[in-house]
Design a protein with these regions (language model features):
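Extracytoplasmic cysteine-anchoring/structural motifs
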Residues: 1-224
Length: 224
């Protein structure tokens, strides 16, 4: 969704005979990637599978809002009166097979068959190719002001061969939450969240250097 702010009182003598439009993105776009750190990737007999992702928020992600087409500003639902107009928390990301974006597949490795995204030490997209999440921005171009206003809750399995010659992997399941930081989900910006899965923690790297109305910026947060 792109909107051009109003151009008023244009005249041929001052506009060179042309009407110009300044189009800008008014939503915020999100994609997600994941990889393993060296504590896991160094073991060829261990695999990591992401089985689910949800977003938790403190009534920040609106499900509906009103945009002023004149100046491209948003009016968010009033709290607490219109709390029902915000997305549920947690907001579960659905699989592509369920009209969502999460690229869940069937690994079929050493008896492990849970629908999941297999990851390794090379960052790979968790979404189906050319699929993104689009959100109504939080507080216009400001984005989040508190690091815990939006969190990612990641559920993943670590499957490993318990002994030499074993044909069935032993599986341990985990769910960890990580704050996505401040200044995110801002109007006109596109974000790539890269999660690094370790044995004891998840680290998230946030990049917004895309061809939207943005400048490059990286942030690192670690959750233990």
């Amino acid at each position: 969704l792109v909107v051009s702010t109003a151009k008023k009182d244009q005249q041929q003598t001052t506009a060179s005979g042309k009407v110009t439009f300044d189009f800008k993105h008014v939503l915020t776009r999100v994609t997600m990637k994941a990889k393993t750190d060296k504590s896991i990737s160094s073991n060829a007999e261990t695999k990591v599978y992401i089985t689910g992702i949800s977003l938790k928020h403190t009534t920040k992600l609106a499900g509906e809002a009103t945009i002023n087409m004149n100046d491209a500003t948003w009016a968010l639902p009033t709290l607490p009166t219109d709390a029902s107009k915000y997305l549920t928390s947690p907001y579960i990301l659905a699989a592509t097979s369920s009209n969502g974006v999460l690229k869940l597949e069937n690994p079929a490795w050493k008896g492990y068959t849970t629908p999941a995204v297999s990851i390794n030490e090379t960052a790979a997209s968790l979404f189906t190719d050319n699929q993104y999440l689009f959100f109504i921005p939080i507080d216009g171009t400001t984005g989040t002001t508190g690091g815990d206003e939006v969190q990612a809750s990641i559920t993943y399995d670590i499957a490993t061969i318990p002994s030499s010659g074993a044909t069935t992997a032993a599986v341990s399941s985990f769910t960890k939450e990580v704050n996505l930081g401040t200044g995110i989900f801002a109007q006109g910006k596109a974000y790539a969240f890269t999660f690094t899965i370790g044995l004891n923690s998840i680290e998230v790297d946030v990049t917004d250097s895309f061809d939207w109305d943005t400048t490059g910026e990286d942030k690192n947060v670690t959750v233990n």
